[in-house]
């Protein structure tokens, strides 16, 4: 058996699979519910533009998850562990932490032994406090395009490089006392190994520091973040990067063997970022298929053999296959924005369960209610500062009449508020995805398939609109779809143990029984429907330009 872990914003999840890559067990720790003493809301604390999480909460979650895992499966049969962490977030391990990891005692908790040697908080991917640092990072390298060409992305507020620079400015003494700066992925791997684990080849691409094609940290960027002549010191704090995503880093630490019953031969395989792990959960055909992860954020993922960068999207090294890449579009306002619309609709109709999606879905699926596309409406809903497009926070509603685009207010007679917000937000979100992924496809005008994972993949109305707007069949994992990231991590572990002589794609296809693994949940629409949505794309671009002009936020 193989274990995949996913240390995400709101939960730590674990998925156990067998040699045939079938899911056997799923366990989870919900931070707000199971570790309520930390008083997080959706896994984080907020202070203006700052969004961060308590690192000790993650340590407690590891212990609790393994307690639950031990009670549900024979963990001694787990041959290898891999997985993922939320991308970009940094963990500052202070001097003495390596020694403490080496000597963990199974009679005490992880938190009790490591708390004093870790900076208390880690910035979350939703953090938007590094505008100044992003501008400085782009300036030192020649602009957003130059930085994207080098590192795969323009400077982003959540990326680790800008976050480290801000941390050094705000906490100079702690920075100097830092022994290791880890990403969540190799922090979790370090805990499991009880020694410092290297950074992962794919996850390191989310730092704005890594020269992807030459596979090394760029000294100019290190100098900008660490200060003049301090680049080598920062490189030492970051440590090495493991190029081989299937590398056996070593056996699991004695703490986990004694406390939970893991085999001392259980291997730890490099953990990667949550998005790179997610693409490993499905056999995506490069340039043909799209994976939509519908979680707190919305991410569109594609595999590709071509290194073609743009400030409009992210390019990462593939987590397993060398000389292959992963393209990612990331939207901060995913499920949280849709939930706000849902809540407003539920309040209008006095729905007792405010978490119910029934009224929201009816507003989209009811044949007597015209969808936003039919009424030629667009809605941009950004309760948080958005990444794509760089705008917000704010809400913008638009109506299309002939060749003209008009900004409208929710109280105008032409807009049935809040019911029509449901179609507007779902259709506009997917129109933006369509607009940005089409140039990345190889030899086809629209995707062959879209795979959906994450919580909203179970929502019929949302999936229906994805199919209509993107113009293709929509598929979902039969098992583990809500935990696709952890599933991908488990498959990564299985490949590391059993995939010798095969590429990752060959290994997965060898074990992949499509009839058992995935299900077709929505058929592609008519060509006419797809074309009608295509006519809205120029108006969406205009709407986003208007929102950018009206927003004073530079992202």
UniProtKB/Swiss-Prot annotation:
Q: What is its main location?
A: cytoplasm
Mind telling me which residue stretches traverse the membrane in this protein?
none
Reactions catalysed according to its record? D-xylulose + ATP = D-xylulose 5-phosphate + ADP + H(+)
Q: Name one Pfam family in it.
A: FGGY_N
Q: Which SUPFAM superfamilies match?
A: Actin-like ATPase domain
**Broadest EC class assigned to this enzyme:** transferase
Q: Does the keyword Mitochondrion apply?
A: no
Q: What Gene3D superfamilies does the record point to?
A: 3.30.420.40
Residues binding ATP: 357, 455-456, 459
Q: What's the family? A: Belongs to the FGGY kinase family.
EC number(s) given by UniProt: 2.7.1.17
Per the database entry, which stretches of residues form a coiled coil? none
An annotated GO BP: D-xylose metabolic process
Q: Return the protein name.
A: Xylulose kinase
> What subcellular compartments does it reside in?
Cytoplasm
Keywords, A to Z? ATP-binding, Carbohydrate metabolism, Cytoplasm, Kinase, Nucleotide-binding, Transferase, Xylose metabolism
Amino-acid positions noted as binding substrate in the UniProt annotation, renumbered to this chain? 88, 158, 274-275
Q: Which InterPro entries is this protein grouped with?
A: ATPase_NBD, D-XK_euk, FGGY_C, FGGY_N
Gene Ontology cellular-component annotations: cytosol; nucleus
MF (Gene Ontology): ATP binding; D-xylulokinase activity
């Amino acid at each position: 058996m193989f274990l995949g872990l996913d240390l995400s914003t709101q939960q730590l999840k674990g998925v156990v699979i067998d040699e045939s890559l079938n899911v056997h067990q799923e366990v989870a720790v919900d931070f707000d519910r199971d570790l309520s003493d930390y008083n997080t809301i959706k896994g984080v604390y907020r202070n203006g533009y700052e969004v961060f999480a308590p690192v000790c909460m993650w340590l407690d979650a590891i212990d609790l998850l393994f307690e639950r895992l031990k009670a549900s499966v024979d963990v001694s049969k787990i041959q290898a562990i891999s997985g993922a962490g939320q991308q970009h977030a940094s963990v500052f391990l202070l001097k003495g932490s390596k020694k403490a990891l080496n000597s963990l005692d199974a009679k005490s908790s992880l938190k009790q032994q490591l708390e004093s040697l870790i900076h208390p908080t880690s910035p979350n991917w939703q953090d938007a406090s590094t505008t100044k640092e992003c501008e400085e990072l782009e300036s030192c390298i020649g602009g957003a395009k130059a930085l994207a060409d080098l590192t795969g992305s323009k400077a982003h507020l959540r990326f680790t490089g800008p976050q480290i620079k801000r941390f050094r400015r705000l906490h100079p003494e702690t920075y100097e006392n830092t022994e290791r700066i880890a990403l969540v992925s190799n922090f979790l791997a370090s805990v499991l190994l009880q020694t410092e684990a290297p950074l992962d080849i794919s996850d390191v691409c989310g730092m704005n520091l890594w020269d992807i094609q030459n596979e090394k940290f760029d000294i100019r960027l290190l100098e900008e973040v660490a200060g003049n002549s301090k680049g080598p010191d920062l490189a030492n704090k970051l440590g090495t990067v493991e190029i081989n995503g299937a590398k056996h880093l070593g056996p699991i630490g004695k703490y986990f063997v004694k406390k939970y019953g893991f085999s001392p031969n259980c291997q730890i395989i490099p953990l990667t970022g949550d998005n790179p792990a997610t693409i490993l959960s499905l056999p995506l055909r490069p340039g043909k298929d799209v994976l939509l992860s519908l979680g707190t954020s919305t991410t569109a993922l594609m595999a590709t053999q071509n290194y073609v960068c743009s400030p409009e999207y992210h390019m990462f090294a593939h987590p397993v296959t060398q000389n292959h890449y992963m393209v990612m579009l990331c939207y901060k306002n995913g499920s949280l924005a849709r939930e706000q619309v849902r809540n407003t609709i539920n309040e209008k109709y006095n729905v007792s369960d405010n978490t119910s999606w029934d009224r929201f879905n009816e507003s989209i699926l009811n044949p007597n209610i015209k969808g936003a596309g039919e009424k030629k409406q667009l809605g941009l809903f950004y309760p948080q500062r958005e990444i794509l497009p760089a705008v917000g926070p704010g809400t913008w509603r638009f109506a299309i009449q002939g060749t003209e685009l008009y900004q409208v207010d929710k109280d105008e007679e032409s807009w049935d508020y809040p019911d029509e917000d449901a179609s507007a937000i779902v259709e506009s979100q997917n129109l933006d995805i369509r607009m940005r992924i089409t140039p990345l496809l190889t030899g086809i005008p629209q995707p062959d398939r879209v795979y959906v994972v994450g919580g909203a993949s179970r929502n019929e109305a949302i999936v229906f609109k994805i199919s209509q707007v993107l113009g293709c069949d929509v598929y979902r994992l039969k098992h583990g779809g809500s935990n696709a990231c952890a599933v991908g991590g488990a498959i990564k572990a299985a490949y590391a143990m059993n995939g010798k002589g095969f590429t990752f794609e060959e290994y997965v296809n060898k074990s992949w029984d499509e009839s058992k693994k995935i299900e077709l949940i929505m058929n592609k629409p008519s060509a006419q429907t797809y074309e009608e949505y295509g006519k809205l794309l120029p108006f969406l671009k205009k709407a986003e330009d208007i929102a950018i002009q009206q927003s004073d936020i530079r992202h």
